[in-house]
Structures are given as C-alpha cells and as structure tokens.
Amino acid sequence: MEDWLQFPEPAPAIRHYVTAQSAGAVRNWLFLVAGLVFLMVIVGGATRLTESGLSIVEWKPITGVIPPLSDKDWAQAFEDYQQIPQYKELFPQMDLSGFKYIYAWEWGHRLLARLIGLVFFIPLVLFWLKNLLPPGVKPKLLLILALGALQGGVGWWMVSSGLVHRTEVAQERLAIHLIIAALIFASCIWVAGGLGSVQPIIIHEHKSRLRLESILLMVFTCLQIFLGGLVAGLRAGLVNNSWPLIDGVFIPSSATLWALDPWWINLLNNPLTVQFIHRMTAYVLFLIALTHLIDSFLNTEGKLKRGAIIVFLHIIVQIILGIATLILVEPPFNGAPHILLALGHQAVAMAVLAVVTLQTRRLLSS
C-alpha cells in the first residue's frame, strides 16, 4: 500500500537570474528597438514621399539584402521597374541615376527592417536562454516578435498592390503597414516601461476616470495614425489646403463627403472624407488630452501630472505641424521643405504615441 502513496519527485524549478541590472538591460534593449522602429517609420515616410516604394519589384527576404553591384545588375533592376505602371505613367523620363536614387531609399528601408529583426531576435534568444527575462515578459516579447514577422509580410502585400494595376500602393494597405509599426513601437515602450524602478503613483480621486481618459488617448492616437496613413496614401493632404474651414465651411456637404457609392467606400477612397475625419479626430484627441490634463492637475501629483503635461504639449505641437503641413504647399514651401515638414509631422505622431503609452501604463498599473 505504501507504494501507492509514493509520488514522483517534483521536477527542479527553473532557475531565474533576474536582477535589477539584468532587468535594466532588457529595458534598454527594448527602448533601443523602439528607437529603431521610430527611425524605420521616418525612413518609410521618406520612401513614400520620394516615390521610392515601388522601385524594388520583388521580395527576397534573405538575398535581397545585397543591392545591384554591377552595371548589368543595375540595368536588370531598372528594366524590372520599367515594366510597372508607375514608371510607364508617371516617370517615363527617369534615367538610371534617378532610378538609383529611389532604389537607395527602398533598399535602405528594407535593410533597416532586417536590422531591427536581428536586433530584436538575437538578444531575445540570449536573454531567454540565460533566464534573464522577468516573469510575465516572455509572452509579450513573443507577441512583439509575431507582430514583426507579420509586418514583413504586410510590407510586401502593400508593395505588391502597386505593381500591376496602380501607380501607387493601396492606401488601406499603407495604413495597415503604418499602424502595425506603431503597435510594435508602443508594445516595446509598454514592456520596457514596466521594467524600471517602481515609484509611487499618487492619485487622490477619480482613478477610474483618469484611466479611461488614458485608454481613450491610446485608442484615438492609434486611430489618428491609421487615418494619417490613409491621408498619405490618398494624397488627401494635397486637397482643400485651408484651415480651419474646408471650402469656406467647417463641415462639408453630405453630397461631397459621401459622393461615392456605397457610402462606406468614402471612408477609404474619398480624399475629402478621409481628410475631414482626420481633422475631426485631431480635435477629439485635443479635447481628451485637455480633459486629462485638468483632471491630472486636480487629482494627481508627481509623474502622472508631469506626464499629462507632456502628452498635452506633444499633441499641441502635432496639431500645429499638421496644420502647417496642410496649408504650406505652395512655394517656397513645396518640394523638399514640405517633405521635411511632413516627416516632422509623422515623427511627432510617433512621439505622441510614446508619451501616451507611458502615461497609460502608469495609470493602469497604479
């Protein structure tokens, strides 16, 4: 009978070697990845604004890291580009030197994507094997890894949309590509933000309301970034270049907003509608940030109050840049100055997402 009551020896517990120093290393690594993703978004924006995104018409995840090296290779790459509608309809006068310029942007964009993959994957494996990852972090890192793999496929899915029947990529695919990059960026910051030293969060009252405001800030910031991708893909920023009115009115007529049939197509394909929604979402985001600022001043102290100020100031700067990008399209601001302005608008959008992510994390973990 005694034999029946004997249980096998328990397996030895997995030993973790997580220290404040190792957690700090993981934190710094994730902030580095976030910084590279930030740079990636800016390079991607420049690639789009210079009309370079369709210059490489094939997807070779491994061998594609090597650019054309000989005159023969360059001639072949240029010939491949000459077969797509963008070259035939928009740039039939482009010569080989012009092609090399746009090729460099797209190749650099793809090279940076590969670099980010390595910078994320190799340290992840090392931290994992040495049991240096804090408890609960592994599933989050695997999710970020999955998002990165998905992003690679979505990038080619986006490019392929502009190779046959269009002279540019599909705007909805561009917006999806951008929002996935934003989610990877925010996820790295979210996880890294939880690995620092814990400081007390002081909230006198209305904690639930403050949390709701922070969640709304996250949701509307991500929505606004997605809408920004649609605006970019449709070139909707080049129509109705006035503010605060659109053709003399604050709200355009329903006949213009819903000109396409069925009605929901306007949400993706009507430049006026997309620009109008982008404007209105900016106003909503401003009001949420202002409400959060007031509530934080009345009910919090320390980091939360400072965080609310930083979020509000970032959104103010972003609105100013958005208005400037919209209205400054004539000389002397067209061309390179306007490209720099648009890239600044895109960069600050990511900065807004970063500070909103940190503020939301503080509130939800308090």
Task: Pin down the residues of each PLM region.
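Polytopic transmembrane helical bundles with strong interfacial aromatic enrichment
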Residues: 2-366
